[in-house]
A protein has these predicted regions:
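Nucleotide-sugar donor-binding catalytic core of glycosyltransferases
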Residues: 2-169
Length: 170
């Protein structure tokens, strides 16, 4: 059995008894209770959200395979900068992320378009990224190796990511 750890330790803790049932654990950070030979330090390989319509609750992708996504042309860039952000405040990184978005909005004004369930909801992150030259990517944590769909979505949308997250990406 293989466990892929997809949440930071502030969000999800794994008891030793739970970890013991896996022969391999793939995680962006070291987990106590996992034998060194069973641990693979790597990105959790989260799937992207770009091009995935979520309003139906069924997560329907506009692309049926990777070749269709690759063939999708670069969208026209009519906006300058966007960010997709939730209003979650459970962790210090989430609170810092909200404070940064607030400060950026105050300084950049209408040049920054803020999206997210509680701000300006979108069914598909494509509509919040594709029209913009830059996309602010704010991870939920600052752990080495731990980047998420937030970063891959910017790349897939042909937007230059302005990134705050895993310090070893760079």
């Amino acid at each position: 059995r293989i466990l892929f750890v997809t949440e930071p330790p502030e969000i999800k803790k794994y008891p030793r008894s739970y970890l013991g049932q896996f022969g391999t654990v793939v995680s962006p950070y070291d987990l106590r209770g996992v034998e060194r030979r069973s641990m693979v330090i790597s990105n959790p390989c989260l799937s992207w959200h770009y091009g995935v319509e979520r309003s139906s609750g069924r997560n329907i992708s506009k692309f049926s395979n990777l070749n269709e996504l690759r063939a999708f042309p670069m969208p026209e860039k009519t906006g300058l900068i966007s960010v997709v952000c939730s209003t979650k405040t459970a962790t210090s990184a989430q609170r810092a992320r909200l404070a940064l978005v607030s400060m950026l909005k105050e300084r950049l004004g209408d040049a920054l378009h803020v999206y997210g369930r509680e701000f300006n909801p979108v069914d598909d992150k494509m509509s919040a990224i594709a029209p913009y030259k830059y996309h602010v990517v704010l991870e939920n944590n600052y752990l080495d190796n731990f980047w998420t769909e937030k970063l891959s979505d910017a790349w897939l949308g042909w937007a230059l990511p302005l990134y705050l997250g895993a310090p070893n990406l760079g």
